[in-house]
C-alpha cells in the first residue's frame, strides 16, 4: 500500500515538492517490502540443516566478527547486515549473545567499500578511508574487550532497555556501537 501511494505521487503529481515526498514514501515502502520478503525467506533458512549447523556453531566471538565482516563486505551495507541479523534473532536462528560480536564485524566491514573507492582516488581520499578503517577497528577492539569481560550484563542491559524485545535489542546494540 505504501509503495502504491508513493508511485501514484511520483507519477501523477505535477508539483516537484509532492513528487519528492512521493519518492520518500516510495523508498520507505520498498524498504519495508524488502524486509518483509527477507523475513518470509528466513523460513527456508530455518529448514536448511547446513545453515542451522553453521549458525549453531557461531559461539566463538572471533567467528561472529568475521561472519559480520564478510556479510557486510559483500552487501556493502552494515544496516542491511544488521537487518538480516535482526530477522535471524527474531526467528530464533541466532543467539542474541553472539549478535554484538557480529555487529562489531559489520562496523569493520562497512569500511570495505570506502577503501575500495579510495583506491582510485587522491591521497586525501586514501587517508580518509584509512582513518575510517582505523577508527572502526580500534573502536571495535575496545568494545570487543568490554564484551568479552561482560557479555551477559551487556545483553541483559540491552534486553532490559528494549523491553525484552529481541529485535529492538539488536537495533539498540547497533545504535550503541555506531
What is each PLM-predicted segment?
Residues 1, 6, 72-109, 118-120, ...:
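Membrane-interfacial helix-loop connectors
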Residues 1, 26-29, 33, 69-75, ...:
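Transmembrane helix-bundle signature of multi-pass membrane transporters/permeases
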Residues 4-8, 25, 62, 66, ...:
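Generic alpha-helical transmembrane segments of integral inner-membrane proteins
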Residues 6-19, 114-120:
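C-terminal ends of transmembrane helices
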Residues 7, 11, 31, 43, ...:
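Juxtamembrane transmembrane-helix boundary motif
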Residues 18-23, 59, 93-101, 163-168:
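Membrane-water interface of transmembrane alpha-helices in multipass transporters/channels
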Residues 24-70, 88-91:
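Helix-loop-helix hairpins and the membrane-proximal interhelical loops
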Residues 35, 46-57, 119-177:
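Transmembrane alpha-helical segments and their short flanking loops
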